[in-house]
């Protein structure tokens, strides 16, 4: 919910963003079908990069591609370990898209900076 509004706002604000995804090159077709290819500055697919999240190098490479320091990036992800732990480890601010699931008791070394139920909840954070 709110995804299209968020994407439109990012376009209007000329705020660059990227995608980091674990998986194969099939992910490119998914990104294309969703109409994101022209909106996304950087796309990192783990099969092409050679390492999967939470490997810190893939997060640093995305930051370099965006030409934004890790400390100035808000990383949004739905997997506590692969996304939130990985991004947090390189100094990114994190937002966990929880999709109705509780934070795992097994992950105590890191917590997300923000917890959201939908991408639309990012707008107030980005506007601040």
List the predicted regions and their residue ranges.
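Asp-based, Mg2+/Mn2+-dependent phosphohydrolase catalytic module
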Residues: 4, 8-11, 15-128
């Amino acid at each position: 919910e709110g995804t299209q509004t968020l994407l439109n706002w990012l376009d209007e604000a000329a705020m660059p963003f990227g995608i980091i995804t674990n998986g194969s090159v099939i992910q490119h077709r998914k990104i294309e079908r969703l109409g994101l290819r022209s909106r996304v500055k950087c796309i990192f697919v783990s099969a092409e990069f050679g390492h999967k999240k939470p490997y810190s190098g893939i997060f640093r490479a995305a930051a370099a591609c965006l030409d934004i320091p890790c400390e100035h990036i808000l990383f949004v992800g739905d997997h506590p370990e692969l996304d939130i732990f990985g991004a947090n480890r390189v100094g990114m601010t994190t937002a966990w898209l929880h999709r109705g699931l509780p934070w795992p008791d097994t992950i105590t070394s890191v917590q997300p900076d923000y917890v959201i139920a939908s991408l639309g909840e990012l707008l107030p954070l980005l506007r601040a």
